[in-house]
Swiss-Prot record:
Binds 1 divalent metal cation per subunit. Can use either Co(2+) or Zn(2+). Pathway: Metabolic intermediate biosynthesis; chorismate biosynthesis; chorismate from D-erythrose 4-phosphate and phosphoenolpyruvate: step 2/7. Belongs to the sugar phosphate cyclases superfamily. Dehydroquinate synthase family. The lineage of its organism: Bacteria, Pseudomonadati, Pseudomonadota, Gammaproteobacteria, Enterobacterales. It comes from Escherichia coli O6:K15:H31 (strain 536 / UPEC). One of its GO terms (cellular component) is cytoplasm. PANTHER family: 3-DEHYDROQUINATE SYNTHASE, 3-DEHYDROQUINATE SYNTHASE, CHLOROPLASTIC. This is 3-dehydroquinate synthase. One of its GO terms (biological process) is aromatic amino acid family biosynthetic process.
Length: 362
């Protein structure tokens, strides 16, 4: 069992990583006997894990209610969020309740925002079931729902009480979802840790076949890197923005193509190549390093071009609504080398459009 602490003073919390955690009541700290829980999951995961997690919590003396949401990015909305509030109020649940997010990024983000908002804030626990949520979205306290005009535009910074990563969940993950998670894994290597990127080049095949030791190391390393950034810049005023490599472009793809048609990791993968091409055009990143990124993403089964039906011009309105925009000016996350990146303002729209065009499918 691995345990990593996200250090945020009185709001610090543990990330527990191991196989078989769903069999251990102690995994779900800080829950105690007699407490009340609303377990939030979706219709795909409920048949796989709901009874198991409910059972282990009830074994610990916890009183468990549940709400099952529809599955898909298109349901990460205010309307679906309201179903969680309704379930909480109907029971009813008070300020001493705990929400448990059992699912991937959609369930985690939506449940976290529900916890931040319900009765002005209740405790919640992240139980991520996808690779993407285990290495990224469950850690750091970003919670949100989407708006038709932009991804994650309505939300809050709100830290969980703990994160429970059961590696066994990856055994039920569809290959496309595994690849989507690998995009966020590769991102960490590009922005923060060149040695980890090298390791990924050598060990990607092991990750694709869900080799236990390789996957455990991969998730642990990501869960070490992200908390370091979050602890230094919890509310994304500077350093934390680096974690958004590829996201300004990627969120544009997701919004333009319709939420759920491109998985988040797929859009981020194409966006990271666009960021690399932008950096190339600025003369601060080599084409050889861009090719290393493209090769690794391709091996992972990820797209490296934008949608053929989306013109370069179609990206700009979405990018100008990005949360990193300051005083009407785009701020882009750009690689400087494998393992090093920067937040860059003042890049001309023409250069960005040309970089996007470099990445359009033939």
């Amino acid at each position: 069992m691995e345990r990593i602490v996200v250090t945020l003073g009185e709001r610090s919390y543990p990330i527990t990583i191991a196989s078989g955690l769903f069999n251990e009541p102690a995994s779900f700290l800080p829950l105690k006997s007699g407490e009340q829980v609303m377990l939030v999951t979706n219709e795909t995961l409920a048949p796989l894990y709901l009874d198991k997690v409910r059972g282990v919590l009830e074994q610990a003396g916890v009183n468990v209610d549940s709400v099952i949401l529809p599955d898909g990015e298109q349901y990460k909305s205010l309307a679906v969020l309201d179903t969680v509030f309704t379930a909480l109020l109907q029971k009813p649940h008070g300020r001493d309740t705990t929400l448990v997010a059992l699912g991937g990024g959609v369930v985690g983000d939506l449940t976290g925002f529900a916890a931040a908002s319900y009765q002005r804030g209740v405790r919640f626990i992240q139980v991520p079931t996808t690779l993407l949520s285990q290495v990224d979205s469950s850690v750091g306290g970003k919670t949100a729902v989407n708006h038709p005009l932009g991804k994650n535009m309505i939300g809050a910074f709100y830290q969980p009480a703990s994160v429970v990563v059961d590696l066994d969940c990856l055994k039920t993950l569809p290959p496309r979802e595994l690849a989507s998670g690998l995009a966020e894994v590769i991102k960490y290597g590009i922005i923060l840790d060149g040695a980890f990127f090298n390791w990924l080049e050598e060990n990607l095949d092991a990750l694709l076949r869900l080799d236990g030791p390789a996957m455990a190391y991969c998730i642990r390393r990501c869960c070490e890197l992200k908390p370091q950034v979050v602890a230094a810049d919890e509310r994304e005023t500077g350093l934390r923005a680096l974690l958004n490599l590829g996201h300004t472009f990627g969120h544009a793809i997701e919004a333009e193509m319709g939420y759920g048609n491109w998985l988040h990791g797929e859009a981020v993968a194409a966006g990271m190549v666009m960021a690399a091409r932008t950096s190339e055009r600025l003369g601060q990143f080599s084409s050889a390093e861009t090719q290393r990124i493209i090769t690794l993403l391709t091996r992972a089964g990820l797209p490296v071009n934008g949608p053929r039906e989306m013109s370069a011009q179609a990206y700009l309105p979405h990018m100008l609504r990005d949360k990193k925009v300051l005083a009407g000016e785009m701020r882009l996350i750009l690689p400087l080398a494998i393992g090093k990146s920067e937040v860059r303002s003042g890049v001309s729209h023409e250069l960005v459009l040309n970089a996007i065009a470099d990445c359009q499918s033939a």
